[in-house]
UniProtKB/Swiss-Prot annotation:
Main location group: cytoplasm
Family to which the UniProt record says this protein belongs: Belongs to the prokaryotic/mitochondrial release factor family.
GO cellular component, one term: cytoplasm
Gene3D superfamilies: 3.30.160.20, 3.30.70.1660, 6.10.140.1950
Gene Ontology molecular function, alphabetical: translation release factor activity, codon specific
Keyword Ligase found: no
SMART domains: PCRF
Name of the protein this chain belongs to: Peptide chain release factor 1
Modification after translation, per record: Methylated by PrmC. Methylation increases the termination efficiency of RF1.
Cellular localization per UniProt: Cytoplasm
Residues modified to N5-methylglutamine: 238
Lineage: Bacteria, Pseudomonadati, Bacteroidota, Bacteroidia, Bacteroidales
Its job: Peptide chain release factor 1 directs the termination of translation in response to the peptide chain termination codons UAG and UAA.
Keyword terms: Cytoplasm, Methylation, Protein biosynthesis
Amino acid sequence: MSENNLLDRLDGLESRFEEISTLITDPAVIADMKRFTKLSKEYRDLEKIHTAGRDYRNLLANIEEAKHTMAKESDEELREMAREMLAEANERLPILEEEIKMLLIPANPEDDKNAIVEIRGGTGGDEAALFAGDLYRMYVKYCESKGWQVEVTDLSEGATGGYKEIVFSVKGEGVYGILKYESGVHRVQRVPATETQGRIHTSAATVAVLPEAEEVDVEINPADIEMQTSRSGGAGGQNVNKVETKVQLTHKPTGMVVVCQQARSQIANRELAMQMLRSKLYDIELSKHNEAIAARRKTMVSTGDRSAKIRTYNYPQGRVTDHRINMTVYNLSAVMDGEVQPFIDALIIAENVERMKEAAL
């Protein structure tokens, strides 16, 4: 993108930034929570571009000033200062241009949301459940390293350990935009503890990452919800098996069912179940959008296809391979201890390359 084209794009967004700056102080807009929330998010995104654009224009002005000084000034000391200024500005300019191009990539409104993560043991029986437990611990350690809050909302334990299924929410800054890359089939190759012949078995677990929908994202008619309660089999202190704290919600129009039993009270479980239901309904629409994106792109990065095999964990070789970007590391133990950031960083870069092409940047 040429310098003039970049300035034209920045000018257009600057006008929008000024418009929103006025709108978010309008009492009528403030009274409309859905509109105000949307505009506030757009304002925060455009503020970053506004700041970078200001720096870019100042840098271009410094370059012109330095060139003018070198052409017109006879004082050698001033000319030397201008040469240094020009060299610094020319070094900074392409870096700032790339930063602006990244900011100009259309923002994904879901990326700032919290997330709901579902891990299910797939093929492999007991070994798959154990691997699902390993993945859960991996994500908990990763989330702890980021300062995020993890809360289990539902689980079903495996016969020999691990989980047939575990569902948990993750709250923090930019959670969904990072964890979304983990959606898909994770495959493990290792010798199970019960294997006497030393043969390597292959098992799998499926990870689904959903953006946590807010009430402004999805409107649910209370008449469409059927609630059933029962005694919880999960953590609940003295209340376990004495009061009906377990909640099952059925969304009648879609037949979707969610269960929550980890909280200590029926009210808390109902709130968590409603949150999960909103997110699942929101995810249906988001999946349609992602399918349209996937049809345009050749890459599998972040399309959210949960049937796609995305990563293999090979224990005998200490190897982890991400098949979407053909990236392999030989530090499996560190990865299982939560060091998944290198994969996520590489996936973000790969997706941004595709998005920059789409945005003609």
